[in-house]
């Protein structure tokens, strides 16, 4: 018997049975308990979702921007009213501590919907005079039906981040959550419907990567926004382009550098480094997992980091005092433990953690101790590859130029940060770092107003911020001639 029973698709404003005959299970990563059996969408179900999205989108786009704004604001109110219940669901599905899901996951998703609800009325075109009797004007029109494909680390937040600009601009969205954390997107769909979003404007189809491939290749979809790993992102982008030259937004992986200079406030730097590696058990795409520390302060910095790691409270996610939970799946647990073994084998110095937590209530969950490696080299796998778990690699450097060169020596370019009291150095270093999201003397906050996205193989396009709306609209140019037409022949 599962906790939440059978979960279906959400199409045309209501829960709907899948036609594939297939299901998959989702488990509580802290206890191993079966949470739900989930129906997997078929190709026919995706077609049905696209058809209902087209119909709903026409009604949604015909509304005034102010009407759409009011409906989205009502959805925000409902999300905030139900924050605690949604946070508990997210806690069970992801394994995150309840203190975290209550304060972050739903809150930041609602903030982004509120932000774009406020911008819906600001979508406008231009008027360009050509001659006294002729001018051009432009219209920003919605793309139509968009697809969102989410990751398992921030299920409801990602669903909000992808749907908010799409809906504000007059589009419909078909959202596929990760099969690892499939539950909260259905609650968001219910909230949108209750708020007044027309049937079909936000549909949810469940399933594994094969369902994501169906969405990416579907000719009736105009844009795909994907969050996940680099290799999967490349496949999604290839399918999207080969099928119908879709617009794409890709928020992919990272191996982000955090540079601590010798003039830094070391207590602050240690606080930042621990947050940048162990928040959400290290399952954050922007984590600063390559920690470069100037040689003169390395020992003092390491001492402070280890003191803070010792204070991390791993435990039951439902305990309000817990601030460190399990990994989201058994597959991720095996992957992270494999990287830890690799770090040991390649000669990194294990300073903390380095093993699975198995005592007492940890035995049935997917917990890995917060792990810190010192004396790391740039050629180690734990330094080069994205782990997506609670593993910090500390490296030393001598000069600013050296730190920048080594920080940039990666195929990734999602995030970067510096800790220094020297304002000139801070900006100089940030301007040289090849990353799309950067922080000075802080780490990790991604407010609605801040564009989020990467350089190099960390992504294409941006989420959040004003400019994202441009990527959910297309420009129509119209020339108007008020005077006599001048024939060519």
Swiss-Prot record:
Q: Where is the active site?
A: 162, 251, 285, 463
- One Pfam family name is Aldedh
Provide the binding site for K(+) 2: 245, 456, 459
User: Which residues bear the site annotation Seems to be a necessary countercharge to the potassium cations?
Assistant: 247
Residues that the record marks as modified (Cysteine sulfenic acid (-SOH)) are 285
Residues bound to K(+) 1 are 26, 93, 180
Annotated protein name in UniProt: Betaine aldehyde dehydrogenase
Q: Which InterPro entries is this protein grouped with? A: Ald_DH/histidinol_DH, Ald_DH_C, Ald_DH_CS_CYS, Ald_DH_CS_GLU, Ald_DH_N, Aldehyde_DH_dom, BADH
* Cofactor(s) recorded in Swiss-Prot or TrEMBL: K(+)
| Complexes and interactors | Dimer of dimers.
Question: What are its E.C. numbers?
Answer: 1.2.1.8
Q: In which pathway does it act?
A: Amine and polyamine biosynthesis; betaine biosynthesis via choline pathway; betaine from betaine aldehyde: step 1/1
| Source organism | Burkholderia pseudomallei (strain 668)
Keyword tags:
Metal-binding, NAD, NADP, Oxidation, Oxidoreductase, Potassium
How cofactor binds (record note)? Binds 2 potassium ions per subunit.
Question: For this protein, what reaction is catalysed?
Answer: betaine aldehyde + NAD(+) + H2O = glycine betaine + NADH + 2 H(+)
User: In which residues is NAD(+) bound?
Assistant: 150-152, 176-179, 229-232, 253, 285, 386
């Amino acid at each position: 018997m599962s906790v939440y029973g059978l979960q279906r698709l959400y199409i045309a404003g209501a829960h709907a049975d899948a036609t594939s005959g297939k299901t998959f299970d989702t488990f509580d990563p802290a206890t191993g308990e079966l949470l739900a059996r989930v129906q997997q969408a078929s190709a026919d179900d995706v077609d049905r979702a696209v058809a209902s999205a087209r119909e709903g989108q026409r009604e949604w786009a015909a509304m005034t921007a102010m009407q759409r704004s009011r409906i989205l604001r009502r959805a925000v109110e409902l999300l905030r009213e139900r924050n605690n219940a949604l946070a508990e669901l997210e806690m069970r599905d992801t394994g995150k501590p309840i203190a975290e899901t209550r304060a972050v996951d739903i809150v930041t998703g609602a903030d982004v919907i509120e932000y774009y609800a406020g911008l819906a009325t600001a979508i406008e075109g231009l008027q360009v005079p050509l001659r006294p009797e002729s001018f051009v004007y432009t219209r920003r029109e919605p793309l139509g039906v968009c697809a969102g494909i989410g990751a398992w680390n921030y299920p409801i937040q990602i669903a909000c981040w992808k749907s908010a600009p799409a809906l504000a601009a007059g589009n419909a969205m078909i959202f596929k959550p990760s099969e690892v954390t499939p539950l909260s997107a259905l609650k968001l769909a219910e909230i949108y419907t209750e708020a007044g979003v027309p049937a079909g404007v936000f549909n949810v189809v469940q399933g594994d990567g094969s369902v994501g491939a169906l969405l990416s290749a579907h000719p009736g979809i105009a844009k795909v926004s994907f969050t996940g790993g680099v290799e999967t992102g490349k496949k999604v982008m290839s399918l999207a382009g080969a099928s119908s030259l879709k617009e794409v937004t890709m928020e992919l992986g990272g191996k982000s550098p955090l540079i601590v200079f010798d003039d830094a406030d070391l207590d602050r730097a240690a606080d930042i480094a621990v947050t940048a590696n162990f928040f959400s058990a290290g399952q954050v795409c922007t984590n600063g997992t390559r920690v470069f520390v100037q040689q003169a302060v390395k020992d003092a910095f390491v001492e402070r980091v280890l003191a803070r790691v010792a204070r991390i409270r791993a435990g039951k996610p439902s305990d309000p005092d817990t601030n460190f939970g399990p990994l989201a799946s058994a597959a991720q647990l095996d992957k992270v433990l494999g990287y830890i073994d690799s770090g040991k084998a390649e000669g990194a110095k294990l300073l903390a953690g380095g093993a699975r937590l198995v005592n007492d209530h940890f035995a049935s969950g997917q917990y890995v101790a917060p792990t810190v490696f010192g004396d790391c080299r740039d050629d180690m796998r734990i330094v080069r590859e994205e782990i997506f778990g609670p593993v910090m690699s500390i490296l030393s450097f001598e000069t600013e130029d050296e730190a920048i060169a080594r920080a940039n020596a990666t195929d990734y370019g999602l995030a970067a940060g510096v800790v220094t009291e020297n304002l000139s150095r801070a900006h100089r270093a940030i301007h040289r770092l090849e990353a799309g999201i950067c922080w000075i003397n802080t780490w990790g906050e991604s407010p609605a107003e801040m564009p989020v996205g990467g350089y190099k193989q960390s992504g294409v396009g941006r989420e959040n911020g004003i400019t994202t709306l441009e990527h959910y609209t297309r420009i129509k140019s119209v020339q108007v001639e008020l005077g006599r037409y001048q024939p060519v022949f």
